[in-house]
Amino acid sequence: MIVRTLEEIEDTDADIKTENWRSKRIVLAREKVGFSVHETTLYAGTVNDFWYANHIEAVFVFEGEGEITDKATGETHQLKPGSLYLLNNHDKHQVRPKTDMRTVCVFNPPVTGREVHDENGVYPVIVEDEEEAAS
């Protein structure tokens, strides 16, 4: 059994901070459970273009408000506490938080925590090597 708190993750290599968002990676590929879990805050007034070409992502909003736009169709949905969006078709999307928006994100395949969005908003697939996974 693994038990973690967000406080334990703060200011570690699993606490990723950018100008637009902060993501605390709670469960990563090294746990070998087939998914990763992150608590991510997207900052008010930012525009975030993402495309998880190599991952499926589910996002549950538990604080704040914003909107998500499907970049293929132009369809926009309002996001508020209790909203969930599932990017089951590797959808290119844009998230625009009106207020700081706190979310729980689940990725499959799991991320390692070392991924960086490329120019298209894509995470590469990074496979944990066996030696790192054992530590």
UniProtKB/Swiss-Prot annotation:
A Pfam family this chain is assigned to: Ectoine_synth
Range of residues in the leader sequence: none
E.C. number(s) listed in UniProt: 4.2.1.108
Tagged with keyword Lyase: yes
Name the UniProt record assigns to this protein: L-ectoine synthase
Pathway entry: Amine and polyamine biosynthesis; ectoine biosynthesis; L-ectoine from L-aspartate 4-semialdehyde: step 3/3
GO BP, one annotated term: ectoine biosynthetic process
Gene it is expressed from: ectC
